Regions:
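Extracellular low-complexity, Gly/Ser/Thr-rich intrinsically disordered linkers
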Residues: 317-494
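Short alpha-helical segments and helix-capping/turn motifs at coil-helix boundaries
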Residues: 133-150, 238, 257-260, 318-322, ...
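Extracellular hydrolytic enzyme modules, especially secreted metalloproteases
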Residues: 157-358, 408
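Extended hydrophobic secondary-structure segments that form protein cores and membrane-embedded regions
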Residues: 31-32, 156-162, 402-403
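N-terminal module-boundary/linker segments of secreted carbohydrate-active enzymes
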Residues: 22-65
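Hydrophobic h-region of N-terminal signal peptides that target proteins for export
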Residues: 11-21
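Active-site-proximal segments of metallohydrolase catalytic domains
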Residues: 72-221
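Sec-dependent signal peptide recognition
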Residues: 3-12
């Protein structure tokens, strides 16, 4: 069935099993480009073909994931994905670039599917949507094999890139293109449920999982941009890159559990982890690293358990810089130090504030411009951001993150993607420094919505939101103890 996460609709099925995994080494990706029969429907974005030149609003050198979306462009997207996972796993996991291939081999080629785009995600026809998405995956693989005899056994993961935008974001208005294709992780259960087969047989190879992704997440490249964003003060601020969605989908494929409620779409760890809202940090080109728990689960880090009553210096996030504090035999805290600085003491927001203040105007430079000009990111010749010096740049602040982990909840719910299903009983819970449990709850604040996480959730000296919850701490370092808000109370009240 379809599941959603506030800003996206995706399909999730499958089992995970244990409380640890060995997500190491590298994987080879088979990328298949597919297009649709041409159409001029208003319910989908684009014509059904890949974008070879921009048709929308010109953001000049600040364009995210610019056209042409040809073979080189998708190779750059795979390089960006590799840079992300190499960085956040400390070189323990990544993409085998040499062993990954984009098909077909021609620069502007694609495999033409038998229907228009809207067939594969018909509006309000919930009873057939999942089956049609599965058919898209099946038809893409079969068509590619028929035309190019691809040896799928040479690859670890199949990624179908389709023409058009993903049906993955909530917009601040009625969605004008509801029949765009949702980004999807397809696994064996989904194939079995919809095709009545254990997998898709191609020659002697059985394919039982894969990913479906759009060519872009940037609406501003398409002719619909003017009607959608033409009245915005700065339309270019509505751009998003593909890397975040790509990393999220690959996260599922390699076994990282989702950390939001996949049935309601409600956030649980917000912008502070890849497997929730953090996939779209930094306008989708700087996704957040997985949470401390996820990195330990993947085998990328081993936490340090300090002696009782000891004092520790906690460096910035790096391999081995997670502290584990036991609470009970099943519960413990994981503490990490995260920084969104582009250079010591300087964040993207502080640069914007300084430039705006010095200009004596009421406006500040756009986030997207400062992100691309001043954060040290690297764009390649295809205009894709392929390297980022620090994937914490997209966080709302710098400081400690304190995670409350309950292995009993995790072990009983991980098989059904339910680690954080119940907001009142979560396996991985962020101790929000402002003393409130905002993440995942509906917000009454129109402009400063904390329900996905904000600066006040991080632990740092000078956090005004912490002081509001703990007035006696004004001027002092924040403290986390039995009499603070939040407190160190265990889930059973001890």
């Amino acid at each position: 069935m379809f599941q959603s996460i506030i800003h996206r609709s995706i399909i999730l099925v499958g089992l995970l099993g244990s409380l640890s995994a060995e997500i190491i080494d590298s994987i080879k990706i088979c990328a298949i480009r597919v297009s649709f029969n041409e159409d001029d429907l208003v319910s989908t974005t684009g014509s059904g073909n890949f974008l070879l030149e921009s048709e929308g609003i010109d953001c000049d050198s600040y364009t995210i994931d610019p056209a042409p979306h040809d073979k080189d462009y998708f190779e750059s997207q795979i390089m960006a994905l590799n840079s992300y996972f190499r960085s956040v796993s400390y070189e323990k996991f990544g993409i085998n670039i040499e062993g990954s291939v984009v098909f077909p081999s021609s620069q502007n080629g694609s495999y033409k599917l038998s229907n228009t785009m809207n067939y594969y995600n018909p509006y309000i026809e919930n009873d057939v949507q999942e089956r049609r998405i599965t058919e898209l995956f099946q038809e893409s693989i079969i068509t590619a094999y028929q035309e190019d005899s691809i040896n799928f056994s040479s690859f670890d993961l199949i990624v179908v890139f389709h023409a058009g935008i993903g049906q993955d974001f909530s917009l601040p208005f009625l969605d004008p293109t509801p029949e765009d294709i949702p980004s999807t992780y397809v696994d064996q259960k989904m194939i079995s449920d919809n095709l009545n087969e254990a997998g898709i047989t191609i020659g002697e190879h059985l394919i039982d999982r894969g990913i479906i992704l759009p060519e872009s997440q940037n609406h501003l490249l398409y002719d619909i941009a003017e009607s959608m964003f033409g009245d915005a003060t700065d339309p270019c601020e509505y751009q998003y890159g593909l890397t975040g969605t790509f990393a999220l989908m690959v996260g599922f494929a390699i076994g990282l559990p989702p950390l939001w409620n996949i049935e309601s779409g409600e956030s649980r760890v917000g912008v502070f982890g890849l497997m929730d809202q953090g996939s779209n940090n930094g306008r989708g080109i700087i996704p957040a690293p997985p949470t401390a728990w996820s990195r330990i689960y993947a085998g990328w880090e081993v936490p340090v358990e300090p002696d009782f009553n000891s004092e520790m210096y906690l460096p910035l996030r790096d391999d081995g810089n997670i502290i584990k504090i036991p609470i009970t035999d099943q519960e413990y805290y994981l503490i990490e130090n995260r920084s969104n600085h582009v250079r010591p003491g300087v964040s993207i927001d502080s640069i914007r504030y300084l430039i705006g203040t010095m200009s004596n105007s009421d406006t500040y430079p756009s986030y997207s411009e400062i992100l691309q000009d001043s954060s040290g990111i690297e764009k390649d010749i295809n205009g894709v951001v392929v390297s980022v010096p620090n994937y914490d740049i997209g966080l709302p602040a710098s400081g400690l993150l304190i995670w409350h982990i309950d292995d009993a909840i995790i072990s009983s719910s991980i098989d059904g993607y339910g680690i954080n299903h119940d907001i009142h009983s979560m396996g991985i819970d962020l101790e929000e420094a402002d003393g409130a449990q905002d993440i995942g709850h509906q917000s009454i604040f129109l402009f400063n919505d904390p329900s996905s996480g904000y600066f006040g959730d991080m632990w740092f000296r000078g956090n005004t939101q912490y002081v509001l919850a703990n007035p006696s701490s004004e001027g002092l370092k924040p403290e986390f103890g039995p009499y603070t808000y939040p407190s160190t109370q265990s889930n059973n009240g001890a």
